[in-house]
Amino acid sequence: MQIKESKPLISIVIPTRNEEKRIGKLLRSIKEQTYKNYEILVGDSSDDKTPNICKKEGAKVFRAKRRGVSAGRNIALKHARGELVAFIDADVILTRRVFEAAVKALENKRTVGVMPLFKPIAGEIPKNKRPIIYFLNDLGNFLIKANGLGGFRVYGCVICRRKDVNKVGYFDEKMHISEDTDFYRRLSKYGKFKALDVYAYYSYRRFIEKGIPRTFLFYIKNALITAAFKKNQNELERIR
């Protein structure tokens, strides 16, 4: 939805691959935002009904030439017209005031990017795994509030200024993992990241599917390597 007013336009960039079971929840949560001046841009490499669902919900869909979240984000970003850009993963669900809070926080010119705190999507977590998942979620929120430790944060939803994004370019499409750490590390040269006092719901499906300890260590290791050594981890397993 886009309206003509003085409030800055937010270009919402969503990479998708076979997200037909989840993307509708994100798109509906976007429609329920208190802040209404936005456009939805999807970079898609799906084999399922994801692009059709997105189009029905009013999103503009662009076919990525290669698989990967970086390619999806980049093709959508090239079509973005907004003063602000919101990079959101397809399995995130927003609470109603995320964009409103982000626009206000970005009035501070020393803030380069903002992100909500996260809550797990409880319905997809087996009861016996809830304690460890909630512990990891609390750790992720701590890292967001602490402005990242070693460059590691939770990047499922980040809103920033387009002019700052233009300074750092695009996501590295050669990276299969930690491409977000690499991108936001470059962006952090121009200001601080700030935690918003609002929440979004985050999917821990990959932790559950692939094993919680293994997935946690996998993400941590590669995020820290990317942040510390500033180099691509091109040999990593592709997980998305």
Where do the PLM segments sit?
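N-proximal low-complexity "stem/linker" segments adjacent to membrane-targeting elements
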Residues: 1-29
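Short, acidic, metal-binding catalytic loop of nucleotide-sugar glycosyltransferases
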Residues: 28-37
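A conserved acidic beta->alpha catalytic loop
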Residues: 29, 42-51, 92
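Acidic donor-binding/catalytic loop of UDP-sugar-dependent glycosyltransferases
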Residues: 49, 90-104, 185
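Glycine-rich, basic loop-to-helix element that forms the pyrophosphate-binding segment
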Residues: 64-80
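Short aromatic/hydrophobic "clamp" motif used to bind/position activated sugar donors
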Residues: 85
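Conserved donor NDP-sugar-binding/catalytic core segment of glycosyltransferases
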Residues: 97-128
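A recurrent flexible, glycine/aromatic-enriched loop bordering the glycosyltransferase active site
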Residues: 120-127, 141-160
